[in-house]
């Protein structure tokens, strides 16, 4: 397990840069969608997949091929960039593709990952499909996972609204295109601020071995007569 301490407010405008757990965003086609904009590990904006015709069970290639959906997600990302104070206007946000990250979230449901493994709803607490650099990510960036964990414990956030009842906030099971990721966030018991995020990662030994170091020769002591 990896713990990330004090992960929020990376840009100096607070955990919730707009001051709201969820904001109503009006798109250029007149559609209104609720989004959660959060600055934790990396500035991110989350939208419910159902609100924009998306599907969190879909493989990344299918999401990439849906030009209308990708255009909507990019519009949401640009508008969030301005609302979060990361860019002065939408044109500037176009050039700043790394942040904020934009992601669709949805409730747990049966899906098949990229390796062909089936995941039952009971094995997850929610699902995510994140866009990174203009493409649907084949898993989910670690920073995006950390942001999701923080948004999950913000009452009335879009993410919180997708989580299965009874889910453990310290061990959220996230359905991603490459399988299940477990992550959790904790609050400071005194201030209520998000104090740490924990993520479980796999590991394997890459190598082991020995290093031989030469030691200086021991001094020769004079022999008694």
Task: Give residue spans per PLM region.
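Non-transmembrane, aqueous-exposed alpha-helical and coiled segments at domain scale
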Residues: 1-225
């Amino acid at each position: 397990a990896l713990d990330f301490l004090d992960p929020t407010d990376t840009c100096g405008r607070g955990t919730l840069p707009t001051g709201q757990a969820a904001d109503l965003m009006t798109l250029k086609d007149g559609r209104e969608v609720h989004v959660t904009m959060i600055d934790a590990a990396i500035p991110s904006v989350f939208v419910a997949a159902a609100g924009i015709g998306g599907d969190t069970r879909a493989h990344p290639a299918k999401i990439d091929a849906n030009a209308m959906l990708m255009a909507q997600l990019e519009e949401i990302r640009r508008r969030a960039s301005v609302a979060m104070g990361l860019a002065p206007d939408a044109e500037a946000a176009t050039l700043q593709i790394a942040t904020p990250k934009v992601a669709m979230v949805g409730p747990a449901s049966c899906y098949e990952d990229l390796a062909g493994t089936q995941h039952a709803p009971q094995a997850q607490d929610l699902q995510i499909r994140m866009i990174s650099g203009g493409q649907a990510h084949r898993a989910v960036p670690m920073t995006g996972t950390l942001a999701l964990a923080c948004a999950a414990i913000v009452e009335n956030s879009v993410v919180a609204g997708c989580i299965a009842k009874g889910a453990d906030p310290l061990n959220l099971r996230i359905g991603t295109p490459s399988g299940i990721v477990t992550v959790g966030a904790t609050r400071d018991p005194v201030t209520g601020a998000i104090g740490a995020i924990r993520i479980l990662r796999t590991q394997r030994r890459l190598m082991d071995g020995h290093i031989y170091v030469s030691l200086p020769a021991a001094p020769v002591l004079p022999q008694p007569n």
